[in-house]
From Swiss-Prot:
Region (Disordered): 94-171
Single GO BP term: post-transcriptional regulation of gene expression
Compositionally biased residues, Basic and acidic residues: 94-113, 133-148
Annotated Basic residues bias: 114-131
Family: Belongs to the ProQ family.
Protein name: RNA chaperone ProQ
Keywords linked to the UniProt accession: Chaperone, Cytoplasm, RNA-binding
InterPro entries: ProQ, ProQ/FinO, ProQ/FinO_sf, ProQ_C
Biased composition (Low complexity): 155-164
Molecular function in Gene Ontology: RNA strand annealing activity; RNA strand-exchange activity
Amino acid sequence: MESPEKFTNSKEVIAFLAETFPKCFSIEGEARPLKIGIFQDLAERLEEDERVSKTLLRSTLRHYTNSWRYLYSIKEGANRVDLDGVEGDAIEKEHADHAKQQLDESKAKAAEKRKAKLAQQPKRKDKRQFNRPKGEKSANSDHADTKRGTKPKNNRPNTTPPAKLTDSDLQQGTQVTVKLGKAPMPAVITEVAKDGIHVQLDSGMVVKVNADALRLARSKRS
């Protein structure tokens, strides 16, 4: 009998844990604070499962508990849960403060990375518009005007371009638009994670995108 294929990354293990222990782990929505010592419980319950090693399990737990979604759940007085969802000790203020500090630091680092990435992107300029005397048209433009017999008109209404999201906008419930095809689609932020932003479209589908792909919905702007 062949051995089952082993998991190779944390994402696969988290999906497995959410399926095996749904009252403890989740991959979307609000996370639940984990019982202190949950690793030992997992190691014992999964001892016979050859698909996940203790090393990968440990790194997966670290990845899960460092996510923004999980850090949001660490509030003073909230109860931790075991693998079966049974509530246990309440979270102390010290632990809640530490989680908030981790969350703030992680958000700051993510903002710096986005800022650095934007700074590295070259400004797109239309070189054809440079060094052309004011009022002079290109040969192609003259030919097109002659052929049509009329001057080209821009019938598009003057609209304000959609606003980019600020750090304060990156939170659950923010109305946004996301460009998945030719036209932007309305969506709502459901989760803000280090590896991307989860948004839910009007169709109900949830997708993960980069913050750069999002714009603030017009209804949210003043």
